[in-house]
């Protein structure tokens, strides 16, 4: 995994240099209600995340991240380690009830049906929706106080991510009032170079290319499928020299990719119907296996899943590549938020929820999660060298393989 993660990290950072600013953000249940506190006064923290999106432990003997600043290995799940850390630091027991969902839309539907969580990890567009609809509990005033020893998020978050969350607002309030970043990345096309050329994969129009009928997968969520559709519909314009060289390129790109006019929405719906007839499937997670088994030759992927897919292919001795469409890419964020209905005025639960976010933001834990799931953390480490050492470790692994 190390070689591929290193390459994708470089790719994401390179894309960031191109699409920073406005375009960087735009792309430019009803179950039984759980009690908040158990009978023995253990704090119950209900966390909902995406599938395969946190270190679950049980690493193999070979899975050791040997950094200059020390070795890192996931023996326990990061959830178990948090529960132990919280008791050691705050003298109170906490039990995380952890569950997973597949899409932002599924998450929203479950919330509207009455399912209760304390901490969830939606994507940026769903964070904005939940903020606008007053679902979210704001962070405590001291959450961003860098003088507090355990405020690892405030001390370690990437300056770019901090600026993005501070400057983007809903109803006059910054994202950072309600959300802390977790992972981020770009979208693109994973493809089999024996079946698909780099040129064919480097455009959103591949999703409707009849040459690959029933051999390509598309993301099964509104934001990503519509983004790809807009990129394909407006491909010629977005790739034109006059458009790219325009002095207000970023603003124009954001305007084109966020065009919600009735005419454009109608075009998108019509186009996605043709894509549905061409694609193998609209999916959330299955494309990773479908690419590895050869059922499909290309798939629209988040960069973290691209890392996993290419790594698994490498273990089976065949190559998969990742292409960023020339039109533009979508730079996305997932972030941790607290729900008002879950916290419900309980100060102990709120402290546990914020501590969970801070624990995940420890540089060592950010590295564990990056290594395990393949995505790029929003944590750059602040004064800690751990994240930087991890990047060096990836690059050196890449260089070592190139020399052999």
What are these regions (language model features)?
Residues 1-12:
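Bacterial N-terminal signal peptides that target proteins for export
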Residues 18-40:
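Sec-dependent signal peptide cleavage junction
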Residues 37-129, 133:
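Early extracytoplasmic/lumenal segment of secretory-pathway proteins
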Residues 46-65, 69-75, 125-278, 282-286, ...:
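Extracytoplasmic ligand-binding site segments that recognize negatively charged/polar headgroups
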Residues 80, 84, 105-117, 132-133, ...:
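Short helices/loops that flank or line small-molecule/ion binding pockets
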Residues 101, 122, 218, 282-283, ...:
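Short beta-strand and adjacent tight-turn residues that come in two discontinuous sequence segments
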Residues 277-345, 394:
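Extracytoplasmic/periplasmic substrate-binding proteins
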Residues 338-404:
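Mature extracytoplasmic/periplasmic domains
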């Amino acid at each position: 995994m190390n070689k591929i993660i290193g390459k994708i990290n470089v790719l994401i950072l390179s894309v960031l240099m191109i699409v920073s600013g406005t375009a960087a953000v735009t792309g430019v249940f009803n179950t039984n209600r759980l009690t908040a506190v158990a009978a023995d006064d253990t704090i119950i923290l209900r966390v909902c995340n995406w599938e395969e999106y946190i270190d679950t432990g049980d690493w193999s003997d070979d899975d050791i991240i040997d950094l200059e600043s020390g070795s890192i290995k996931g023996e326990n799940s990061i959830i178990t380690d948090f529960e132990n850390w919280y008791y050691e630091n705050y003298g109170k027991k906490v039990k995380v009830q952890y569950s997973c969902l597949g899409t932002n839309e599924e998450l929203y539907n479950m919330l509207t049906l009455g399912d209760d969580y304390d901490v969830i990890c939606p994507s940026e567009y769903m964070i904005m929706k939940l903020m606008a609809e007053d679902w979210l509990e704001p962070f405590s005033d001291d959450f961003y106080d860098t003088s507090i020893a355990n405020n690892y998020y405030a001390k370690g978050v990437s300056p770019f991510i901090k600026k993005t969350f501070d400057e983007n607002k809903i109803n006059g309030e910054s994202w950072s009032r309600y959300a802390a970043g977790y992972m981020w990345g770009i979208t693109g096309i994973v493809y089999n170079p024996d079946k698909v050329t780099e040129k064919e994969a480097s455009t959103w129009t591949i999703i409707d290319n009849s040459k690959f009928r029933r051999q390509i997968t598309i993301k099964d969520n509104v934001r990503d499928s519509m983004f790809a559709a807009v990129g394909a519909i407006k491909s010629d314009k977005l790739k034109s020299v006059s458009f790219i060289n325009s002095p207000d390129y970023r603003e124009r790109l954001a305007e084109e990719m966020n065009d919600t006019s009735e005419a454009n929405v109608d075009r998108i719906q019509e186009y996605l119907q043709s894509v549905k007839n061409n694609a193998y499937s609209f999916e959330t997670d299955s494309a990773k296996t479908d690419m590895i088994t050869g059922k499909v030759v290309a798939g629209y992927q988040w960069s973290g899943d691209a890392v996993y897919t290419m790594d698994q292919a490498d273990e089976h001795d065949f190559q998969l590549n990742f292409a960023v469409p020339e039109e533009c890419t979508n730079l996305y964020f997932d972030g941790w938020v607290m729900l008002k209905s879950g916290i419900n005025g309980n100060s102990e639960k709120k402290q546990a929820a914020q501590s969970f976010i801070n624990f995940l933001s420890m540089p060592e834990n950010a590295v564990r999660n990056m290594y395990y799931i393949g995505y790029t953390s929003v944590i750059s480490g602040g004064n800690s060298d751990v994240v930087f050492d991890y990047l060096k470790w990836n690059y050196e692994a890449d260089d070592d393989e190139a020399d052999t």
